[in-house]
Amino acid sequence: MFGSPKRAALAAASLLAIFGNGPSVMAQETSSNNAVVADGKTFALNGENVSYRFRVNETTGDLVSDHFGGSITGDLFPGFGAEALGGWVGLAGRFRREFPDHGRGDFRIPAVRIRQEAGYTVTDLQYQSYSVIPGKPALPGLPSTFGSEEDVTTLVVHLYDNYSSIAVDLSYSIFPKYDAIVRSANVTNKGTQNITVEALSSFSFDFPYEDLEMISLRGDWAREAHRQRRKVEYGLQGFGSSTGFSSHLHNPFLAIVHPSTTESQGEAWGFNLVYTGSFSVDVEKGSQGLTRALLGFNPSQLSWQLGAGETLTSPECVSVYSSDGIGGMSRSFHRLYRNHLIKSKFATSDRPPLLNSWEGLYFDYNESTIYRLAEESAALGVKLFVMDDGWFGDKYPRVSDNAGLGDWVPNPDRFPDGLTPLVEDVTKLKAGNSSTDLRFGLWVEPEMANPNSTLYHEHPDWVLHAGQYPRTLQRNQLVLNLALPEVQDYIIDEITNILNSSAISYVKWDFNRAMHETPSPSNDHEYILGMYRVFDTLTTRFPDVLWEGCASGGGRFDPGVLEYFPQIWTSDNTDALMRITIQLGTSLAYPPSAMGAHLSAVPNAQTGRTIPVKFRGHVAMMGGSFGLELDPAELQEDEKAEVPGLIALAEKVNPIILTGDMWRLRLPEESNWPAVLFISEDGNQAVLFYFQLGPNVNHATPWLRLQGLDPKATYSVDGNGSYSGATLMNMGLQYKFESDYDSKVVFLQKQ
């Protein structure tokens, strides 16, 4: 017990011995752009508006966190840990630890837990050395951000446990222009006995004692990405996925903010795991008020054995800092992902307006039906026609969701001569009154198999299964085990054959169920590594194909998928009112350029709601990939007459959506008049999306203040005169709406 003043003083001295006194900077190595400054004792990463500092305690070799926030220079004020007043004190748990290991007196959740062959889970990871690398190495087998030596600098800190011969390398890559620090960790077995990694975080940070709040994205099928903001309480709180994919339930995104932080003001820290598998986000406020945030593998889905010389690499975690509120945080993510994550040539290229056959026809079609739909699509001005589920399966034809998955050959009853004649006929059609040929796209779900399929009958061992336990069906299908190289090769070969057979310029890659009955905890990560190999091989082999990710909507809307697929279907819910919430929630981390959004028929297939076509179109064109999800023959004549104009408007705004900055002016959770402003990359153009959700009877409409404009410049506002940026931001503008579900799209031009 530390009941006496003498014992309290001794305890305080012990704390300082473990974690040192205040830090000072540096007789040091400095990168050419000053982004990394290090001397082996103290480390600093510097962006345009961010500083990240940590140090080594020279007595123990522990890494201690000092600062992650606004830019700082020079020496740091000498802080101290919590005083050891009366009572039992867990020493390590009272200080800010940069990469907390397990079993040495820190009883908060660790960043790493490793079981040795003897059963021990204690690690004593001490600082050994560091290296500074211009640019950024890729992660083996995993998606990762990229950049040149001018864009990014990487610091690698090497830790070592002398007792177990376990090495951990911590990687910090800073993109100064984006105030972004990307972290990952390697665990290497340098000993002779096997070890098992049971927990590993890509990112960990201990915030100082402050009142903080956390923001996450929760949901389920058809209601993804609902923003949730709550106070960080004492104790452990967090979320994650154990479904085998990032999932609709929780996105691998976290923001930490102050209670006073708003969209446009205050500090915000954002974290996003570049991973598509099961994950864990943990936030723990310890007894001393320090808040620990960790993102990484889900420990319940990880038991990774390492033999001598073997290494486990964690996914990357992107962290950004903004002093310009939650909106500033989002814009940093958007810019970074557009320029340094998405590798597709389509990352910032105009996306063709498309029509997808699903909600128009579902499974009920044949060659003539599809051609008729393509003809009507082209007449409206659509430039890409997509044939969704139902085109494949020979012995087990895909006429419902009961059969066919896994057999990627055209259904001979529907397409007796294969797809080639259909594709040739469709791609001869002209979009609207233009000379542009209609393009052809296809839906696939290659990671699945129906029990009613030739593939399953020939290879029942290829699906996920746990011995003799029943194989649980979901949507009448099973998951192929992409941990198996032969399964990966099969998928690569089948999709290659399809794309080589016809002029297919777009692929929608779906994934419609969770993973059950996995054979081992490590299988989840092995699956994801296999999936990334498939994605990388096919997107490299077919760089001119526009790939779109999907998982029953936004179930895999994560940075891992974005590296390979430049756009993702945001939600199966196409109801325009709900889509505003879903799309603005998704935009907390992900660029609107990556969102697939479609104008669908009414009453809406998911909600039964009827909303005017103009409102539906305006909501959909806020996504980078605008499309239609309907049968034009079923439209009312007045609706059909409006669609070509909406397609033309979507094409006009698309370049700004793809490369510009997004400002969420009002949120649908907080206002009857949500509004979003997009400003072009050069600042010369802007487009405002402004909505009225419910009726506004006998009451004034509020003024709307814009953001992000040049206060000294003058802007013309869609035929309503010219005004200074200062006037538009400080006074605002006001519009009259006619009814519920009314909307406006307003263009601004800098003069």
UniProtKB/Swiss-Prot annotation:
It is an enzyme of class 3 (hydrolase). SUPFAM superfamilies: (Trans)glycosidases (SSF51445). It comes from the Eukaryota. The keyword Zinc does not apply. Keywords: Carbohydrate metabolism, Glycoprotein, Glycosidase, Hydrolase, Magnesium, NAD, Polysaccharide degradation, Secreted, Signal. One of its GO terms (cellular component) is extracellular region. InterPro entries: Aldolase_TIM, Alpga-gal_N_sf, Alpha-glycosidase_related, Glyco_hydro_27/36_CS, Glyco_hydro_36, Glyco_hydro_36_C, Glyco_hydro_36_N, Glyco_hydro_b. Its EC number is 3.2.1.22. GO terms for biological process: polysaccharide catabolic process. It holds the Pfam family Melibiase. It catalyses: Hydrolysis of terminal, non-reducing alpha-D-galactose residues in alpha-D-galactosides, including galactose oligosaccharides, galactomannans and galactolipids. Its cofactor is Mg(2+); NAD(+). Glycans are attached at residues 49, 57, 162, 186, 194, 366, 433, 452, 500, 720. GO terms for molecular function: alpha-galactosidase activity. Hydrolyzes a variety of simple alpha-D-galactoside as well as more complex molecules such as oligosaccharides and polysaccharides. Homotetramer. Belongs to the glycosyl hydrolase 36 family. This is Probable alpha-galactosidase C. The lineage of its organism: Eukaryota, Fungi, Dikarya, Ascomycota, Pezizomycotina. The gene is aglC.
